[in-house]
Amino acid sequence: GHGMDIHHFERAADAAALWIADPSLKVGARILRATEASFAATGVNTNLGIVLLCVPLAKAAAEVDAGTGLRRRLAVILSMLDEDDAGNAFAAIRLANPAGLGQVGKGDVSSANPRLMLIEAMHLARDRDRIANAYVTAFEDIFDFALPVLSDARALTDDFSLAVSTLHMALLAEIEDSHIARKYGRDAARQVRERAQELRSHWRPVVTPKSFEHLKEFDTKLKELGLNPGTTADFVVATIFCGLLSGRKQT
């Protein structure tokens, strides 16, 4: 979307990285600062979803508590998000202005003073937004589904890009993309998911150089229709990041 190319994402990532990992800031402040820096570097919303997913992971990874795993530390951090976190996260979302984000009443991001904990706001949004659902479930989609898919794919190919393509298609086939649903409706999101399922023979158990050509045709068709599975892409990035933080051999 927005006529973006790989350079937009690279510049946004460079700009956001220091803020995502800033140990002096709470989760909400990291989200806002990273989004502001990304926007200043590119002028468009390139990575709001990535920032929302990666900031809590980065904070959890830095917690000094060797007795618990990354997911447990993440769950504690998510449960402690407060009104300040909500205010800053909402400000970041308003700045990025993701497509199709309408007003929904309580917990609406257009509120400058949300007066509820960030995790409460995520509970209100979880049925229509998969990133909100991730906050509520301590990143269930990543830990229980996406990480195992990526790990299995890495065991079957030495080409990391093919493993990532496998992960992308598996997520697309498993979960309706929130970005498509917001912008074009649930029917459009469901149809994209079903098409990804129909292409299963081209990406299970792993994408190959030959099957990748078929998947490129699918990608071209989505672009022609203006359908951008942006939330799926956010989860791909967050899964790779989570795998690296977990110490899994992903690259």
Segments the model singles out, each with a brief description of its role:
Residues 1-25, 61-220, 224, 246-251:
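Phosphate-rich cofactor/ligand-interacting catalytic cores and adjacent structured alpha/beta frameworks
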Residues 30, 49-53, 89, 159-167, ...:
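Residue-level detector of well-ordered alpha-helical segments, enriched
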Residues 42-56, 225-241:
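Conserved phosphate/anionic-ligand binding catalytic regions in large, soluble enzymes, centered on
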